[in-house]
Amino acid sequence: MATQLIENKLKLLPEKPGCYLMKDINGTVIYVGKSKNLKNRVRSYFKSKQVGRRAELVREIRDYDIITVSTDKEAFLLEITLIKKYQPYYNVQLKQGTGYPYIEITREHDPQTRLTSIVCKDGGYYFGPYPNVYAAQATLKFIQKVFPLRRCHGYQGRPCLYYHMGQCLGACFKKVPQKEYDEQIKKIKRFLNGDIGAVKQDLTQKMEQASEQLEFERAAEIRDQLKYIEETVEKQKIISNDNTQRDIFNYYVDKSWISIQIFFLRQAKLLRRETRMFPLTDITDPEDAFTSFIVQFYGQKNRVLPKEVLIPAGFDNDTLAEVLTVPVRTPQRGQKKSLLDMAKDNAKLKLDDKFRLLELGNRKTKGAQKEIFDALGLPYGHIIESFDHSHIQGADPVSALVVFKDGEPDKTAYRKYKLKGEVEHQNGGDEVRNTREVVRRRYGRLLREHKKMPDLILMDGGQIQVDACEDVLRNELNLNIPVAGMVKDDKHRTNHLLFGDPINGVPLKLIPLNPKSEGFYLMTRIQDEVHRFAITFHRRRHAKNALSSRLDSIKGIGPKSRNKLLRKFGSLKKIKEASVDDLRAAGLTLPQAQTVKLML
């Protein structure tokens, strides 16, 4: 249902291309979209019945902004910029990077080959990415042996060890002719582009010779080299009749979800494939979600553009090609059309599997979280945050925060807090101070950084923790976030939520959850997770401080020497096991090393 503000703004919408930013009650941008006609697109959110994820979005919209542009290309680029800036909840968020390594030939006066996960526009040559990291490492070592460039750190006035082994051209002690480097680089590029027949034949002969001479370890080593070369360079059968680097995109839509399949063709082989699936915010225009995904996909760090992108029919290929700066084509027949159809079949297969798993998992995640919000009489929220404290008789106090989004842990958002100072002993006052400090630090920072607030805070404790948390939120930070306590029974088992709104005349009361419900299981899981996280952090901190204290008690070992030992060995056990020479290698003098051995 559109508010009066939205109704008034809808009348002023222009019939121009551009982007729109949907905002919630807090003014947070929750969705960014683009359209060739802003008037028609934005009005469609409020003038027709919505279902699925789009219905959820519309229920949360309280305002919107628009930005007009001149062309579709500008709308594409602006949409990606806005999504990166605001990271809206209802937009698909792509993870950065592939996680796979590349083999790089560096662009330097004395070039070298190396593995890297970062692709830069520095004029170097990049090959990959390679899904099998171990095979990529082994292939790199093979290249460095057979096609040497530079393996040392550069000129040092004398030949390096690798030069004597035939794995360095000698930049360590002389000027290597550029022609020599160019010839080697040409061979490496030919090898990594799939021309490996001669190399394989040579290795096979050497393996057979080693076997005939009963050098079985050497034969096995060569056999492994052949296997790794096949993993990285020759992994797939040839499925194309040219060597053009291509990425193939196709998609399938069902039940307000889109599944996108990507095939990566390199050296005429299917190197690997990826599948991405996400719920559609605008079910009426899946084509827009598909093209936006492609632009975002190549906007990620370490994504290397191919020479050509293939997509199905029905899209503005010219605009997409202009945005990506590579040709975008739609094959009509032949082998490329077959690959495009295969990508769609795979997208459908993956989505069908997803639905079967969703039916099982949704009851335990999003459905379970809804049960908690329903029990508290709150509208559904996506983010729950929970705190717990840990210390031993007041020593080394810490707090931990866990975050659950739609019923699942978001471990990238977990946080650890070293509490300032030490408390004398554990009592209610200490819990109050710990709670106030960590709540102030957490949500004060979110305010300063204009980050999204959680929809519910669960404190691991009773009224003391809830009151302390609400006092800081409302009276210091001017925030109105619902806070509930997870209350345990006399057997230390969670059995109720403590919730209310005393400021508005609603006293705190115990709210039971059905012990057999998914909501109860989720609450227990959140409490177990925050307790585990806090205890683990405290144990590590306490062990580290105990080790520091033990070292500080040794005469002649000051803070600098202590830190050297901690960096080198990490634990008291390893320091005890270290020899005097090992201790000296860590940076201690001979008398210091002897004293440490004697005292420990």
UniProtKB/Swiss-Prot annotation:
GO terms for cellular component: cytoplasm; excinuclease repair complex. Residues 15-92 form the GIY-YIG domain. The keyword Transferase does not apply. It comes from the Bacteria. It is found in: Cytoplasm. One of its GO terms (molecular function) is excinuclease ABC activity. Gene3D superfamilies: 5' to 3' exonuclease, C-terminal subdomain, GIY-YIG endonuclease, UVR domain, UvrC, RNAse H endonuclease domain. SMART domains: GIYc. The keyword Manganese does not apply. Keywords: Cytoplasm, DNA damage, DNA excision, DNA repair, Excision nuclease, SOS response. SUPFAM superfamilies: C-terminal UvrC-binding domain of UvrB, GIY-YIG endonuclease, RuvA domain 2-like. InterPro entries: GIY-YIG_endonuc, GIY-YIG_endonuc_sf, GIY-YIG_UvrC_Cho, RuvA_2-like, UVR_dom, UVR_dom_sf, UvrABC_protein_C, UvrC. GO terms for biological process: nucleotide-excision repair; SOS response. Residues 197-232 form the UVR domain. Interacts with UvrB in an incision complex. The UvrABC repair system catalyzes the recognition and processing of DNA lesions. UvrC both incises the 5' and 3' sides of the lesion. The N-terminal half is responsible for the 3' incision and the C-terminal half is responsible for the 5' incision. NCBIfam families: uvrC. Belongs to the UvrC family. This is UvrABC system protein C.
